[in-house]
Amino acid sequence: MATMRKLVMKGPKESEIITVERPVINKPTEVLVKLHYCGVCMSEHYDWTTAPAGRTFGHEPMGTVVEVGEGVTRVKVGDRVSMGAGGGAEYQKLDEKWVHKIPDNVEDHQGIIEPLWCLVSAVSKVRLPIQSEKVAVVGCGYMGCGAISLLAMRGVKVVAVDINPESLKNALKYGACEAYLPEELPEEYITTRNTYKGVDVDSAVKNAASTGFPLVMEWGETAESLDLAIRMTRQCGQLAIGAYHTGGKRLVDVQLLNVRAIDCLSTHPREQDLNFRSAECAMRMLGDDTWSYKHVPTKVYPASMFDKAHEELEIKFGKWMKAVIDWENEDFEPYIIND
């Protein structure tokens, strides 16, 4: 019986590597992939802190096809592929429809497709203003900067906001035209609750239509960033929420969301057809350099240091933007790929 290593949780914040049976192809359209990398996603961080025994993680894997069923036509043995689940072990078996081939000019760590298709899907859903108008992105980590790069490609000017100065530098690097700490935002970028009492109505209406942004994308996930994003959205504008995945409830100003008639859009990727098309689109754009979001500082950890990778998510700012675990190599000191 062939075996493989698998990462499972022993409890909150504590994982272990166990040995299990390697999956075997038993359907004609299945492929077997030997993993190289799996991304460490912030959306799993809260669940990692509260994980019960036996819980597994890893939805950002990539690797090499080592075996295919007799009916497989999309990929062949030796192809590098990425997918959206099953990154918690050395090998993964899945139907060929769930794998996406990585272009030859894209490095392994650059070809982790799941977060990239989430970005393409999210930006495809938003209501963009005309070219050269300003939109805002609140939260400028890996996902926020990816969204900034795509929005800039679409011809709008992006104003970036984050609580970390290092993240603002990244935002400017990936396409933002302006970048601010929350307390430094210009007055005209923040909307106010207007009751129309004691003011000229025409002036009030004009002010409501000119302050804030017609589109704000939120990638910070905290109550503070969500609340700020609401206050930055113009009357009748659109607030696109991309990062609120896990954790408890958030206390935000829903009243302002309502009285300003803000269109609130969840960009969470739940449409399988759109996810597939977004993944294929992302791979094409990376392959032909239409989308230059490949050169992202990435820290690599051995699978045995999965917990350390999560611990360091909160101190990465200004040092690296993305973390991955390496299933091919063991017992090495974590290092940063800064290309």
What label would you give each PLM region?
Residues 6, 30, 60-62, 80, ...:
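Residue-level marker of beta-strand positions
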Residues 21-39, 46-87:
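Glycine-rich beta-strand-centered segment in the early N-terminal region that forms part
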Residues 137-140, 152-225:
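Adenosine-nucleotide cofactor-binding segment
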Residues 199-206, 248-298, 308:
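C-terminal substrate-binding/catalytic core of Rossmann-like NAD(P)-dependent dehydrogenases/reductases
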